[in-house]
């Protein structure tokens, strides 16, 4: 019979997977619009490329030969990588110009090369426990940059006193996912998991606080902004 500790770890990691799925699904509304218009319009494909790189690096960290016992980190980021790649393919297909299409393809190649460099370096130049520390440090830096990216949007909310560009459910999903994985990391005593997700938890709470304050003032129309914020 599994111990209470094992059950708690699994429950926290599973909750993080579920809340992360809500984040991965958040751009669906944007891509429904792209499919309907058969054009990417003014939407930016860069956030999906950064998210793909982040998912690939964190997926690598969760694999047994890098960090044993982190399978739920691998599953959530494997699913995330599939979603981001699908979004990027749609973006390439519906790009308004050949220049934009080639730019996204070129950046996608760089993302793949960057991930290949990290994964190969971790295998050929590092043994345990240095391998886990190397990949963990890279994944932590990537996660922190992803969690910090909405700071610009928070600034827009404060200046405009409008939550139009900061969807509530996206902020809530970020908060809940970060809380779940912060707990998961604490239970595993894994600094590379609980520290960046702890920061994500704080930033998610700040977004929710801003939403609670400014949503009372906001009387705008539906947003045309992409739901994956950068």
UniProtKB/Swiss-Prot annotation:
Its main location: membrane. Keywords: Cell membrane, Membrane, Repeat, Sugar transport, Transmembrane, Transmembrane helix, Transport. It comes from the Eukaryota. One of its GO terms (biological process) is carbohydrate transport. Residues 1-6, 67-72, 125-137, 189-190 are extracellular. Residues 28-45, 94-103, 159-167, 212-230 are cytoplasmic. InterPro entries: SWEET, SWEET_rpt. GO terms for molecular function: identical protein binding; sugar transmembrane transporter activity. The chain crosses the membrane at residues 7-27, 46-66, 73-93, 104-124, 138-158, 168-188, 191-211. It is a multi-pass membrane protein. Residues 13-98, 133-217 form the MtN3/slv domain. It is found in: Cell membrane. GO terms for cellular component: membrane; plasma membrane. Mediates both low-affinity uptake and efflux of sugar across the plasma membrane. Forms homooligomers and/or heterooligomers. Belongs to the SWEET sugar transporter family. This is Bidirectional sugar transporter SWEET2b.
């Amino acid at each position: 019979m599994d111990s209470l500790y094992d059950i708690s770890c699994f429950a926290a990691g599973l909750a993080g997977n579920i809340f992360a799925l809500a984040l991965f699904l958040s751009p669906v509304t944007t891509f429904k619009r792209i499919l309907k218009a058969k054009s990417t319009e003014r939407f930016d494909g860069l956030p999906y490329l950064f998210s793909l790189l982040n998912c690939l690096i964190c997926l690598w960290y969760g694999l047994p030969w890098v960090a044993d016992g982190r399978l739920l980190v691998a599953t959530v980021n494997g699913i995330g990588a599939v979603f981001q790649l699908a979004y990027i393919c749609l973006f390439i297909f519906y790009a308004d110009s050949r220049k934009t299409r080639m730019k996204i393809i070129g950046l996608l190649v760089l993302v793949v090369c960057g991930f290949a460099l990290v994964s190969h370096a971790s295998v050929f130049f590092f043994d345990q426990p240095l391998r886990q520390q190397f990949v963990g440090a890279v994944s932590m830096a990537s996660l922190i940059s992803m969690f910090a990216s909405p700071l610009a949007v928070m600034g827009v909310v404060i200046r405009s006193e409008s939550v139009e560009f900061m969807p509530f459910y996206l902020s809530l999903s970020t908060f809940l996912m970060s809380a779940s994985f912060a707990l998961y990391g604490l239970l595993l005593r894994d600094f590379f998991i609980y520290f960046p997700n702890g920061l994500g938890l704080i930033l998610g709470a700040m977004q929710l606080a801003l939403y609670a304050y400014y949503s009372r003032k906001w009387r705008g129309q539906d947003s045309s902004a992409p739901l994956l914020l950068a």
